[in-house]
């Protein structure tokens, strides 16, 4: 009678173990075994983090083992069990069966061996059937739903507990936004201010009451230099929203600025038009905010938005500085162009309005839409169309870890009606919905391809714009990811025809296009992929967006937004319509009140924290791949990333403002916060 040694590994996360009865059946080319109870007398099996081995003897020869079936049956109380993997030592072989899934209730799961296979590689009926059934089950579990009209579709789940267990957080308490924000304010010693809505600060120094306990190197420098034009300009390159600035190739008619207005700022004895031709003028246009409804959820506090246009100049030191700001889109007598030569407080308030507008675009478009929602689309499509045995599922699953869960929690607590977002933000109460609906029309595939996005904004010349660290580091990380995906693609797809004939891949890409991009041709998202090169690029987009791009725009929020005047989440007075009337008192009364300041500070602190046991780029502790060539590619990937870490660390030495958001040792694998 054939005998097998079965080793079962239980996950190490909280509540991963089980006391339920676990049964195993083996399915082979010559037949199926009876189910065997995996149990040792006087031994606590399947404990959290444990590895348990069992000898299983079957009555008849099973032939080549294709599948392992695991069944969980109730002992006393039901407890979920997280199965990492099973290994099987046969008389002639050693087989690994990756799982990395939860088995809930009186559930069962059927596992294939860990060798990645395309659908064309499965010639055995039972394996084809298993592949088809897995996708049929997943497509019932992972359903598309419209969160808001015009948005990319999301997961069909009203709350976190409605999600499939495999994509829920290990501990829901750890991602409770209400609890985390309250904890943040308690830890930051600012909870005494959190209910003081409508109560203004006295002056800029008064903001230090909620700042001094929590400052760090960058936030301290922001506090000390936020009023300076150099600091203002620097943030467009290396702050937490470094994706808006672009080279100005033609002065827009809606910004009627002249050489005479800005000649004091121009250092090359050239006219403004000549500076434009020389490539020294840059622009940031917040047109998307024009006409967006401001938050009206608090009848006691009027809140306001603007849609500024900011003109910037590259001076002789190659630094970017502002030279003209118009606070709304339509030029006119009541919409003056503010200049550095205006009174101190006129110019300062104009810059504050730009910073506030930048905050809104950053939170809702750069961060929410272009990383969170896009990554959720990739994740849902992956689960619906790629079986666990598919090499691209094995590649991508680490990069959508907890993404659907964090977005569901955000819809449940943060971005919902009367949620936390409404408490402090001028775009709460529905404005953020309008913003996403507009921005989706400009969401393109090429804008997610990092090198193309940089080039499209005219920001690709490293000698011409030498201090754009977001660009420099991003390109290094992009190239490392693309090199890795190219290797993986070449292992499983020997030529372009194999790519084109992989129907599961094509269904994945089509799902993203149809449901994520709502079938919008102008998005430029492919409906199909027909070459290895394009597949590598597509996979790079998925991984880069979920990891590097999210890290670049998320984890600097506390650094750049904790000093409230530098990133006001709301403004309590409308933009000035004339020059020479702004006072310091007016600025302070325009800035957020104490309560909203505290909620904002708690938010940017909580959102800037890494998860406990964070997995950073290149870390793949779940061994979905078992083949040697892919494992070797992973090792090379990690070495490339380590080299980038060293390059960035060397550049940052002795810098007063180090840029480290795209250092791979600070880039989580996925959008999970």
Curated annotation (Swiss-Prot):
Binding, Fe cation: 367, 372, 550, 554, 673
GO molecular function terms noted in the UniProt entry: arachidonate 12(S)-lipoxygenase activity; arachidonate 5-lipoxygenase activity; arachidonate 8(S)-lipoxygenase activity; hydrolase activity; iron ion binding
Cofactor: Fe cation
Main location: cytoplasm
Domain called Lipoxygenase: residue spans: 118-673
Pfam families: Lipoxygenase (PF00305), PLAT (PF01477)
Protein name, entry field: Polyunsaturated fatty acid 5-lipoxygenase
Gene3D superfamilies: 3.10.450.60, Lipoxygenase-1, Domain 5 (1.20.245.10), PLAT/LH2 domain (2.60.60.20)
Assembly: Homodimer. Interacts with ALOX5AP and LTC4S. Interacts with COTL1, the interaction is required for stability and efficient catalytic activity. Interacts with PIK3R1; this interaction bridges ALOX5 with CD40 after CD40 ligation in B cells and leads to the production of reactive oxygen species (ROS). Interacts (via PLAT domain) with DICER1 (via Dicer dsRNA-binding fold domain); this interaction enhances arachidonate 5-lipoxygenase activity and modifies the miRNA precursor processing activity of DICER1.
Residues of the site described as Essential for stabilizing binding to COTL1: 103
Binding residues annotated for Ca(2+) 1, in chain numbering: 17, 79-80
Phosphoserine modified-residue sites: 271, 523
Family annotation (SUPFAM superfamilies): Lipase/lipooxygenase domain (PLAT/LH2 domain), Lipoxigenase
A GO CC term attached to the entry: dendrite
Cofactor comment: Binds 1 Fe cation per subunit.
Pathway recorded for this protein: Lipid metabolism; leukotriene A4 biosynthesis
Modification after translation, per record: Serine phosphorylation by MAPKAPK2 is stimulated by arachidonic acid. Phosphorylation on Ser-523 by PKA has an inhibitory effect. Phosphorylation on Ser-271 prevents export from the nucleus. Phosphorylation at Ser-523 is stimulated by 8-bromo-3',5'-cyclic AMP or prostaglandin E2.
Cell compartment(s), UniProt: Cytoplasm; Nucleus matrix; Nucleus membrane; Cytoplasm, Perinuclear region
InterPro entries: LipOase, LipOase_C, LipOase_C_sf, LipOase_CS, LipOase_Fe_BS, LipOase_mml, PLAT/LH2_dom, PLAT/LH2_dom_sf
Function: Catalyzes the oxygenation of arachidonate to 5-hydroperoxyeicosatetraenoate (5-HPETE) followed by the dehydration to 5,6- epoxyeicosatetraenoate (Leukotriene A4/LTA4), the first two steps in the biosynthesis of leukotrienes, which are potent mediators of inflammation. Also catalyzes the oxygenation of arachidonate into 8-hydroperoxyicosatetraenoate (8-HPETE) and 12-hydroperoxyicosatetraenoate (12-HPETE). Displays lipoxin synthase activity being able to convert (15S)-HETE into a conjugate tetraene.
Sites where the protein binds Ca(2+) 2: 18-19, 44-45, 47
Native organism taxonomy: Eukaryota, Metazoa, Chordata, Craniata, Vertebrata
